Structures are given as C-alpha cells and as structure tokens.
C-alpha cells in the first residue's frame, strides 16, 4: 500500500533483499477479525514447521532403508509450499478481511481448499509422495521402529494441520456469507480491476461518507465599524 514500507518477511540486514509485503494486523485488519486472521497466519507457520519436520522424518526414513525420492520430494514441498502458502492463501485471506474483497475471499476458498485436500493426502502418507503420513509410518515399523516413531510425528502434525484448515474454512465462509459476499461481487471486482489493490475499509468508508463537517468560514463576518445593522 502506498505510504507504507514493506515489512514482511523480516529479513536480516546483511541479506541484499527487501521485504515484499506490508503486514500489520492491528493497522489494517478490523478489530473483530484480527484474532481469526492471526490464527490463519499461525496455521501457515505451523504448516511450514510440519513440512520441516517431515523433511527430517523422510531423512530418517531414507537412512533406515526407505527411498531417497521421498526425501527429495519432502525438500521440494518445503521449498515450494512454504512461500506459496503465504502468497497463495494467507495473503488472499489477509486482503479479503482488510478490504472486504469478495474476489480475495473466492481466491482463498479455492486455493485453501486445494491445500486442505493436499494436506489430507500428506497425512494419509501414500508411498512415493514425499510425506511421512500414517500409512508410511505404521508400515515402516516392521523395518525400523526408531525411524517409524520419528515418522509418526509429521503424520500427527499433518493431521492437526488438516483439522485446523477445516475449521478455518468453515469460520471464514460463515463470516463471508454474513457480510453479503457473492460470486457476482467477485466478478465485478475482477472486471473493474479493483481486486489487484482493493482499498482498505477505512478508505471505502471515507469515500462513502465524504467530508462529515460542513464548510464554514473560519472567521465570522461582522458589519464594518460605524455601519448599521439591517
């Protein structure tokens, strides 16, 4: 947004890169939605941590006799889904609540729904998917109990992530329907281009209400000295 310096991600000074986004919950998100948006943000952090734990578990799986392809895919998922999760489903949710944007709500539901399905698949743990889910962990107990115990941790975390994602989808959808959002409104935002940088709720209110104070001269006008009152 104009006039506000990007502050996310908070990069160390020695890295010659600058933050890409401006993020301030108390400044941009209405107070009644701040808790929910923060929870979505923490869910993204938890999912990133889950991918990191899954990478370690896939390494243990590989060392104990599993396929190295799972470790390679786990590394790919960590490098891919960590930034993409922030950009593709957290930022749409953030912008949707910031400016009551139906287009961003729709983007969140579509992408976050796909993320939810993928997380369920990761929790199940099909072989060759690079995810230490329940099937992979339980099936590996016959080969290595130690590695299988390590593999149970990401299975639990993937399950928790999927459960929390389901709760977030229902909560956001309930709020979205309660505010009068619709697919038609999202189409209007798309056709007008306002979805790219939707104004904040405060800016929308100011544009709607305009200047609430009438314009009066700052100094009252009196008759000249010696004049007569009408």
Swiss-Prot record:
**Keyword Protein transport included in the entry's annotation:** yes
Pfam families the UniProt entry points to:
SCAMP
Q: Which UniProt keywords apply?
A: Membrane, Phosphoprotein, Protein transport, Transmembrane, Transmembrane helix, Transport
> Mainly resides where?
membrane
Please report the record's description of how this protein sits within the membrane.
Answer: Multi-pass membrane protein
Q: Region (Disordered): which ranges?
A: 208-230
Give its localization.
Membrane
GO BP term, example: protein transport
Q: Which residues carry this modification: Phosphothreonine?
A: 194
Q: From the record, give the transmembrane residue ranges.
A: 40-60, 61-81, 105-125, 149-169
Q: Which domain of life is it from?
A: Eukaryota
**Which regions of this chain are Cytoplasmic-facing, per the record's topological domains?**
1-39, 170-230
CC annotations in GO: recycling endosome membrane; trans-Golgi network membrane
As for what it does, the entry says: Probably involved in membrane protein trafficking.
> What family classification does the UniProt entry report for this protein?
Belongs to the SCAMP family.
Q: What protein name applies here?
A: Secretory carrier-associated membrane protein 4
- The record lists the organism as Bos taurus (Bovine)
Q: Which gene encodes it?
A: SCAMP4
């Amino acid at each position: 947004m104009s006039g506000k310096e990007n502050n996310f991600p908070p990069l160390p000074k020695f890295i010659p890169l600058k933050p890409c986004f401006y993020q301030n919950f108390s400044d941009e998100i209405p107070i009644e939605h701040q808790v929910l948006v923060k929870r979505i943000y923490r869910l993204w952090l938890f999912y990133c941590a889950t991918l990191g734990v899954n990478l370690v578990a896939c390494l243990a799986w590989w060392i104990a006799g599993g396929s190295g392809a799972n470790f390679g895919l786990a590394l790919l998922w960590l490098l891919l889904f960590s930034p993409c999760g922030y950009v593709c489903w957290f930022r749409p949710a953030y912008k949707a609540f910031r400016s009551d944007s139906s287009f961003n709500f729709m983007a969140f539901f579509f992408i976050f729904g796909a993320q939810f399905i993928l997380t369920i698949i990761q929790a199940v743990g099909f072989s060759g998917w690079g995810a230490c889910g329940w099937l992979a962990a339980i099936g590996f107990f016959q080969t290595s109990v130690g590695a299988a115990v390590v593999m149970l941790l990401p299975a639990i975390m993937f399950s928790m992530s999927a459960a929390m994602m389901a709760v977030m989808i229902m909560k956001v959808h309930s709020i979205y329907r309660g505010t009068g959002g619709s697919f038609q409104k999202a189409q209007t935002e798309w056709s007008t281009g306002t979805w790219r940088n939707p104004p904040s709720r405060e800016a929308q209110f100011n544009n709607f209400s305009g200047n609430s104070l009438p314009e009066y001269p700052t100094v009252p006008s009196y008759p000249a000295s010696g004049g007569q009152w009408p």
